[in-house]
Amino acid sequence: MPATDFQGSFGRSLLSLRRDQVDSSTVVSGSSSHHEPSTMEVELDSFQRQVAEKFIDLNASSNDLLSLEWIGKLLDSFLCCQEEFRAIVFNHRSQISKSPMDRLISDYFERSIKALDVCNAIRDGIEQIRQWEKLADIVISALDSHRPIGEGQLRRAKKALIDLAIGMLDEKDHPSGTNLAHRNRSFGRVKDSHHRSIGHFRSLSWSVSRSWSASKQLQALASNLATPRPNDVVASNGLAVPVYTMTSVLLFVMWVLVAAIPCQDRGLQVNFFVPRHFQWAAPVMSLHDKIVEESKRRDRKNCCGLLKEIDRIEKSSRLMNELIDSIHFPLNDDKEVEVKQRVDELVQVREALRNGLDPFERKVREVFHRIVRSRTESLDSL
């Protein structure tokens, strides 16, 4: 669906919904006064439109869907939405403490705490990918184009390729990968200044445990997530809508991270659906459907992560492994040229990982700390 198509499928805005409510009341009362949108209504509608525009942009770049660069853009979009949502909560904090907003905002922050464990699990997955990068380095070094290729070099490359293939097995087939999760510390140990946050969040102390399940965590994040009831929208002066919006965006972002990056007990079976009358529903559901289709591809069904770079390194290393198996000595010129070509391909994949993982990890860390800060500020202000 082209990005321009979403412009016509924005759905009904918060302002139009509010106008309908006002029009209904004026018909009952017999009044014909024209309703002018308040500053608050304009602010809340602007937030809905911003979320929609962010996801329209992500659809426009969906040729790079699930690449490190694309997921980085998704995280940037989340951070922008989170900052706008934080401003809305701060600007209307007097209403946040009243019913039904006290219940709705508390529910949002409870879900956001669950997202912290997902961020920690993704950090573990990044470390796992770095181990694969090191194994690719061994293969590249062993088959260096500046030296003649001998049997010893092939054996060294072959061993690294076998280790890489084993490491890239889905953890259901190879559960030893979960050792990373037990060993790594979480983002929250970087600074001690957020002492109150550390007291509030167990997720800040250590990374996820060996028994932790990404699939179950996503299900917990999605549990009982429902569109705001009309009476809650009215009683909260519309504030229930951005809370639902931000909760849905949070769930979608965490779902994408689990889909893309290796982590314990991956699973994408989450009931995620947004009614089309929300401005941002069409672009979000379009991305959701594309990712589900990608996960159903025959060659991706049992992979450890849908990240584009993982697919590339898996294919490149498999082709290299098959080539090495076909080599007999003495090595003829054609085979030597073919080996060099495969090495060059592996170098490109390795460089993509090397250049992309660090910025990606920094963004995941920023998401983690932004969620913590938002929750802490809420505790301080309520």
UniProtKB/Swiss-Prot annotation:
Induction (UniProt): Rapidly induced by cold.
Compartmental location: Cell membrane; Cytoplasm; Nucleus; Vesicle
Membrane topology: Single-pass membrane protein
DNA-binding is among the record's keywords: no
Main location: membrane
Source organism superkingdom: Eukaryota
Keyword Nuclease annotated: no
Assigned keywords, A-Z: Auxin signaling pathway, Brassinosteroid signaling pathway, Cell membrane, Cytoplasm, Developmental protein, Membrane, Nucleus, Stress response, Transmembrane, Transmembrane helix
Record note on disruption phenotype: No visible phenotype. Longer hypocotyls and greater fresh weight. Greater production of lateral roots due to increased lateral root primordium initiation and associated with a stronger auxin signal in stage I lateral root primordia where PIN1 and PIN3 accumulates abnormally, as a result of defective PIN-FORMED (PIN) auxin efflux carrier proteins exocytosis. Strongly inhibited by the auxin influx inhibitor 2-naphthoxyacetic acid (2-NOA); this impact is partially eliminated by the auxin efflux inhibitor N-naphthylphthalamic acid (NPA).
Residues spanning the membrane: 241-261
A biological process from GO: export across plasma membrane
GO cellular component, one term: plasma membrane
Tissue specificity field: Expressed in roots, stems, leaves, flowers, siliques and seedlings, with highest levels in roots.
Family that this chain belongs to: Belongs to the ROH1 family.
Function according to Swiss-Prot or TrEMBL: Together with TRANSTHYRETIN-LIKE protein (TTL), prevents plant growth and development, but by opposition to TTL, regulates positively cold tolerance, probably in a brassinosteroid (BR) and allantoin-dependent manner. Controls lateral root initiation by modulating exocytic vesicular trafficking-mediated PIN-FORMED (PIN, e.g. PIN1 and PIN3) auxin efflux carrier proteins recycling, thus influencing polar auxin efflux transport in lateral root primordia.
Assembly with partners or alone: Interacts with GRF6/14-3-3lambda via its N-terminal region. Binds to TTL. Associates to the exocyst at the plasma membrane and in small vesicles; binds directly to SEC3A, SEC5A, SEC6, SEC10, SEC15B, EXO70B1, EXO70C1, EXO70E1, EXO70F1 AND EXO84B.
Protein name: Protein BYPASS1-LIKE
Species of origin: Arabidopsis thaliana
UniProt lineage: Eukaryota, Viridiplantae, Streptophyta, Embryophyta, Tracheophyta
